[in-house]
Amino acid sequence: GNFKFSKLENLDQFNLKPAFLNEGIIFFDNKGSVLRFNDEQKIIWKNNFYSKSEKKLKPKLNFAINNEDLIVVDNIAKYFSINLNSGELNWIKNNSYPFNSDIKIFEDKFFAIDYKNTLRCFNIMDGSECWNLQTEDSFTISNSKFSLIILDGKVIFNNSIGDITAVDIETGLIAWQLPTQSSSIINETYNFKISKLVSDGDAIFFSNNKNEFYSIDVKTGTTNWINKINSNLKPILTKDLIFTVS
C-alpha cells in the first residue's frame, strides 16, 4: 500500500527506513510519534514519548525489531524500547550524545554509534549500558550515517574520520583498527562520506567520496586492495562480483 507520513525534511540524507512487519509497518512522524500501521494502512497504535520541547526538535528515529520489542535510537540522544503489540513503553533512557547509525542486535544486546564516534552496547531488557568504545573524534559533525556490521563475535564499524574498528562483542575491547584517511580529515568530516560496510564473511567492502574502494580482511583488518572508485553508495555483493555506482 501507499503509506502517507507527515513531511520529514531531508529524509534521504538521514537514510531513515520504516520497520517492516509480517503485517504492516512502523514509522514515525515529524514530532517523533511512533505509528504502527496494518496492511490496510489503518493505524493500530500511535504513541509519543517526547516532551513538548523535544517534539519541536523533530527527532529522527532509527528502528530495530527484537521479538516483541521495537528498539529505537534517535538524533536527540534518546533511546527506548516499545512493545510491538501494544505500543506501550518498556523503558526509555538518555545518551550523552545523539545517535548517528542504524541499530544492530545480537542475542540480548543492541549496538549503536553516536556523533562522538562512540560505539555503545546496551542491554535489550532494560537499556542499561554494557560497555562503550570511543574512537577518535572530529572537529565537525559528520553529514553521513555511520555503519556497523556483526561478524565472528565482533562489531565492525566506521566513524566520521574513516577509521574502521573491530570490537569484541562481549568485552568491548578493540580487536583491530584500520585508519583509512590522513589526519587532516579531522577538519573535513562534514564533507567526507563513506558507504555502508558489507561483507562476504572473509572481507569487508566499502567505498567513499575520496575515490577509494576498499577490501579489508575480516580477521586482521589489513587491506586486501584499494580501487579508484568514487562512491558513497552501499556496494552489492553477488557470488564473486561486487556492484557499486559511482
What residue ranges belong to the model's regions?
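Structural signature of WD-repeat beta-propellers
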Residues: 29-30, 38, 67, 74-75, ...
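Short loop/turn segments that connect beta-strands within beta-propeller blades
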Residues: 38-42, 83-87, 123-127, 169-172, ...
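Repeat-solenoid scaffold signature
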Residues: 154-162
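Short, catalytically relevant binding-site loops at active-site mouths
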Residues: 163, 211-213, 230-234, 243
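Extracytoplasmic beta-rich repeat domains
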Residues: 1-22, 43-67, 88-107, 128-152, ...
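Acidic/polar residues in short coil/turn loops that connect beta-strands
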Residues: 21-23, 31, 40, 76, ...
